Amino acid sequence: MSQDKKATLLSSEDAANQNFATDNQISGGCAKCGCEVLIHYHYDSGKPVPNAPFILIDSNKTEIHGKTDANGLCKIYDMGCGTFELMLDEGSDDFKPRETVENNPVLQSNPAYATLAGEYFTLFLLLRKQGLVTYDADDSSDRHVDVDGAGIFTSIPKEYRKSYDRFWELDKRINRGSRQLKQAINKIHHSLAAEVADKGGDDNAALMLFCEIALGFIPVVGQAMDVYSIGEWSWQSYQEPARLEDPLHIAEGALCAIGVIPGLGDALKVSGRAIIRALKVGTPKELQFAIRTIRSLSDGNLVKGLTKLRAELRNYGAQAKALLLKIHAALKQVLAESKLKNNWIVSLMKDSFSAMITSLEKLIAKYDSALAYIESKFNEFIGKVITRVSGSARPKGSIAKAAEAPKAPAHAESQAAKPATPKSDNSITKADDGKPTNAVSEKKRRTSSKETEDISAGSNKGEQPDHAPQQKKAGEEDNACKAGSDKCQGEGEPVDMATGYVVDWRTDVELTGLLPLSMKRYYRSGGERKPGLLGALWRTNWDMSLELENGIATLTDGELNQAVFVLPDEGAFSRAPSSPQWRLARQQGQLVLQHVDGLRYRFEHALGLQLCLSAIEDRAGNRIALLWDRAELCWIVLPDGRLVHVETQQRRIVKLTLCDEHRQPLKTLSSYQYDAQGHLLSVRAGEGRNFDYQYSPQGWLLRWSDLAHTWVEHEYDAAGRALRDRTAEGFWPGAFRYDDDAFTSHYHSGFGGVTTYVRDARNNILLRREPDGGEHRFEWVDNQLAAEIDPLGGRTEYQRNDWGQVTAVTLPDGSVHRYDYDDDGQLLAYTDPLGNAWHYSRNAQGLVETASDPEGRSWHHAYTTQGLLSAVNGPDGCEQRYHYNRRGLLERLEPGEAPAVTFFYDGHDRLTARHIAHEQGVQVRRWDYEGGRNTPSKVVYEDGSETRFGYDGEGNLTSVTDALGQRYLFRYGAFDNLLETTDPLGATVRYHYNAESEFAGVTNSQGQMWQYRFDTAGRLSEERHYDGRVYRYDYDVAGQLTRRTAPDGSRLEYGYDVGGRLSEIQACRADGASEGATTFTYDLSGRLLKAASPDAVVEYAYNRAGQVVSERVNGEEVRTGYDDGGQRSVVEGLLSSLSLGWQGGRLTTLSIGSHQPLTFSHTASGYEQRRSNGEGFALRHEWSATGLLSGQALDGVNGVLERRYQYDVLDCLTGITDSHWGEQAFRLNGAGQVTAERREQGRQRQARLFGYDSEQNLCEVSAIAPDGAGRLSAKNAAVQLSSGYDEAGRVTQRGGRQYQYDACGRLVSRRESRPGFRPQETRFEWDAQDRLVRVSLPDGARWRYGYDAFGRRVSKVREGQVPSAQAVARVAYRWDGDQLSGQTQYRVDGSVTRAVQWVYEPGSFRPLAQVEEQAGQTRLHYIVADLTGTARELCSETGEVHWRGEQGLWGPHREEKIPIPLRRYLGDAANEEVYCELRYQGQVYDAETGLYYNRHRYYDPELGQYISADPIGLAGGLRPQGYVHNPMEWVDPFGLVGCPLKDSPLGKNGVELERTVSKKGNVKVDTLFENSNDAKNWAAEKLGPGKTRMYDSNGKWIGWQNKTGDSVYWGHNDWGKGVGKSTYPHLNININGEKGHLFLRDKIINRGQWDDFSNAFK
């Protein structure tokens, strides 16, 4: 492994960013100059060079002597300000090169065996090349080596007759020999023959024979290339006899022999060759090149290391000489026998073989003098080991300033060539190319800087042979490689539209661990096939192989993708332009393939010229070994010691079994069956992974099916391309047509449209024409996407590095996003179009150690030796620690301020228990499983209650039975689509799907149907609601929504900027008149700057990390500041400014204006325990052991406020005991709705019964009065209210009120009739965006409402006459994001009558305080909110209750301001001027209508539902008008009821919106999160601790990827970008075989966008 060393001169910015500090400071003696520099001397692995002496000569010619500290640091101050020169010696650490181990004892210990084997393999390779012999691995065993010869009809060429006869003579001798000999011969057939055979591809039989005989004497298997170097040395000596007089040539021959000696032989060879070649030239460049070559062996003090190697030279030289003597004797014996018998050697080789033996004799004769020569060169070289650096000093104090502007960079004179431009062809990269010569070289781990120049040693082994012919050929072959399967654009079920081939991807096995193991398989109906572990048609990721031919290696991966490489020399690597994600390197003689994700693949088992995958490793050293025996995979060894037994028949896997360390079976992972042709017929791999297959004689997949309802059939043309699909339930009824001359394919979809694809000769899609004519164009360079042009002409360009990673993205608006990587493809920095940068420094394993955002905040990470995350430290000082079991599973989580969590697993790595160490005792949750299922059959909760789960054969959840015995049922159809759900009350809902198995509607329990229709491109075109009203949608050719037409004819028309972001919404009434335009403006980074609507202009400003620092609405600004941890700490611009203090992620203090701060204390579990201000107000919270709120009380005053909560075993609220309002008890039905409420207050008792229909609509409310004995009985119930509903679930009549709705389902009339009174009617008017804009009251008053671009109400104005000059004529509202932060009431003359500010608990809608300003006076009241976040009390700063309120269940709100005129008791409310308009979370009371404004809608407490339909449609649940099903537990702060999208809170795990089975058989999941932080945190947990890419939780996002290739990466933060669901702001995920989106709720900014978003999930 390369461990390059470098000296870095740190700029001030580098020093600050990397947190470097040292007490090792030396004065240069020039205080007048006062300049400084910070030296950081380290290896490329990141390890420091400790205690290294140095001399620095500054611009004053002053010599400054010093030594680095233990961290490789030293600061020089008061030095000359110009250029300086720095010379550094070696450090105090040790140089420890890897030692090779002897592992070839059978042949080495028996010269006769070695000689026999050498001649045997030479003949075998020569004859195999002529097609005359073939090794039969199937019939070979420890007792027999089986080789098949030419058939009786094959003529043996005359020149090969003696060779052929001699081979069979040797074959008999081997098979008559010992068992150990036959084992060794079989081993060589599979382990050594491939590269030696490839080297012998030039028909040089003499060289091949020489090498094969020598091979038998080599102690270290795997050194085949070193063997060849001995033979090649002899061949060169034969061709140029004069070279035998050159001491350098003789010395190189001696070193070739030393290199194969176990132990330090290889290190001596590498060092010796580098030294003598460098000293021969003698230039500083060559000397430094040699230093860097030797440095590739190890970190450490090179002088001490070379001294130790020099001392070993004589010992290893003697062993090598003895080895040469044995080889020489064997060669002489073979030659002597051949002369006597006039055999094949004489006929094929003539004099060349004899001459090579003569060259070897001369080497042996001069061997001792060669050792002396090498030793003298070691002595000469050791004195020249030094590192030189030149650079410029920094001004005084620079290092202490993190924001110092960049100065002139330090220039590193490393005596090597300056870095060259990275190569993009197949050439081998060497050290003097300026790039690491080892694909796993430990690269720069720190944030790159123009001011930091490294001295880096490569790992090249000196002069290299000319690879030009191979490079040319490899380039030609790689240029013919087709586009990879990851570029597949599929249609149907599924078909690759570039080729027309049916393709299929499946994952059969997934095992977690230190390095997770998966077995994935791939099928395609046409193209070249390569039989593998699953037979003739399917290929697995374990089938990855290298095919060698004349110095070229062709990689074929598990999906038949190919890449062509030149075989690299030792210490170098080569690239394949068409697959830049791979690099092929040679390390210690072995070929190693490295992927950009950091995984390394080794190939040590040979099948002829094919090398099979033998190991997978990560950067942390975790390794999966694949053990082969004579072409059959037998075992897979996992990093934790467990094994997978691979049972095969005819080299095909028939069973995979997980075994423990002692090879005892634990679990059958999968089993396979085949037909006589080797075609895979069935797979049994556990729930959801069981399939049966049928094929045509040509191997075309005709049908596959699972064990449930899903099947797919294909028809083909003569070329194996799909013509038509047929599937269960008629999904994907597509047809395919091809125009080969035009490289064009057509897909006729089930929607009636035709999608056309045009490809290039390499199967890259150049054009995709949608059914509506829109054309997407793509440009490719070496199979890498270089640009794409959308149908509107917007061009996006991609720049890439040598790894194929995108380094710059230029969007259609010209903005550029930049990504910086180190030499191994690890992200170092991201820079947004405004120049803000996020930096990442990494450890030797490539894992992020520090992530820093543009605001200077840093997150620090520590890891175990296995590369698992062990600790995270945030910029606020919070630390979270992780501990793992031996299998790499999380065993203990210590989340800083919260209790530790311990996890337990069974032998199948399934979670079985979780212990949380609460202060009330350990809380235990358990999971039980049935058989081998990975999904739990039962969960036992902390209180002992249980929930049971049932599944079908495909692993779909079919039933849930809760602790009360209530059962929920689920039924599925083809492709695991959910068809029916039945709740415990028997209500059944049915779901419908379109032609491509996407959700297309629902039939509710009452038979009403909500339907979606789609256009020819598969886009939602029509939405038909329960009542028959229809919304229609139109799109442009780029797939962007351009128009929504409502049932009444009103329209919303959408416009987009060049970047695809929503830029304008035009609202038009049914008569065509415009209601005005809403416009959106963005900055270069895509962040919203301005949203202007007819009623409001909203403007935003951001800090460098992208956090909002200013929100201005109609000129009124709310300013936000953040602390070091990124938490909101200051809010200004409101009535009273807010100051927030945080500790460990918890709110600890809150200051409101100049009032005494509130302080907060928390339980060990993180729940709020107490809040107080030190002046009398103190609110205490009590929590159950399972985290349920059990009580609230005001401390210090008995009885003034105490509230307690009771729950059932399902944690549902069943009772409230309130010191003021009395006691409440609730009874719930199977749907979780309250069916009975009993209240007791003193001696007063009453009860109510609630009746619902199957759609959970409240139909009837009955009251129960106590009988004479005070008892409450249901038989005494009397109906109070009954409601009538229409087919859409809207209330049409309730009591004496009638309700009418318009064509869009919005309330337009509320008419109340009372006997003896004139009917009272309230009229409601709406705009095209479904916003209530005007109310006309029965008394003639009219109120008009205004909104901003996001649907937030910003004003309420009374139109016409007002009753008095003191009456409120206008109300203005203030917003802080989605929180209604206040309102100001104005009189007719514009004077303020009352201003209110509401303060909420951070990140929620739970009110915390109310600030009022009236008549110049400001007063503060603290709000006490109940379980659901409803304001219940207003308390003064001294703790007195001044107001009480209670929201009735399905009824009106009641309040108490001042119960008696004179305050007598502290518990009595006082001061009738104090009141609170807040209701349920997110709601504010409108006195004029009695409605509650609820952000996106208006809630009518009398109806218990909203007065307009949910703007997000069915995404809000099956009751578009309904409020939550149980307001005693659930809230809807956004007015998007029931909708998992908008129920508050979403929770840290988000809410799953949709789960489907993709056409490839993988699961696709879309989830909604509150914001990107929550989404990232959730994703980080899913990916596990072994992530190699990550971003901090407060800045821009790039992505994470773990060791298995699972990933989470940023989609976009903009609106209207992408196609389909990808148009909405999201992250992308690919985790555990599940792909999908993580949508961000806070980026969906207005009602129109909610409509669009909702429609995407219908």
Curated annotation (Swiss-Prot):
Alphabetized UniProt keyword annotations:
Hydrolase, Nuclease, Repeat, Toxin, Virulence
Q: Where is this region: Disordered?
A: 393-494
Q: Where is the composition biased (Basic and acidic residues)?
A: 473-490
Coiled coil residues, start to end: none
Mind telling me which InterPro entries this protein's record contains? DUF6531, RHS, Rhs_assc_core, RHS_repeat, RhsC-like_FIX, T6SS_VgrG/RHS, YD
Report the EC code(s) recorded for this entry: 3.1.-.-
Under which main EC class is this enzyme filed?
hydrolase
Q: Where are the YD repeats?
A: 821-857, 939-966, 1014-1050, 1326-1355
Q: Name the Gene Ontology molecular function terms of this record.
A: nuclease activity; toxin activity
Q: What happens when the gene is disrupted?
A: A double rhsC-rhsIC deletion is not outcompeted by wild-type cells.
Q: Which Gene3D superfamilies is this protein grouped with?
A: RHS repeat-associated core (2.180.10.10)
Please list the residue ranges that the record marks as compositionally biased, kind Low complexity: 400-413
**UniProt family annotation:** Belongs to the RHS/WapA nuclease family.
Q: What does the UniProt function comment say about this protein?
A: Putative toxic component of a toxin-immunity protein module, which may function as a cellular contact-dependent growth inhibition (CDI) system. Expression of the C-terminus (residues 1519-1658) in E.coli inhibits growth but does not alter nucleoid structure. Its effect is blocked by cognate immunity protein RhsIC.
Query: Could you tell me what this protein is called?
Result: Putative deoxyribonuclease RhsC
Source species:
Dickeya dadantii (strain 3937)
Lineage, uppermost ranks: Bacteria, Pseudomonadati, Pseudomonadota, Gammaproteobacteria, Enterobacterales
Provide the gene name from the record. Answer: rhsC
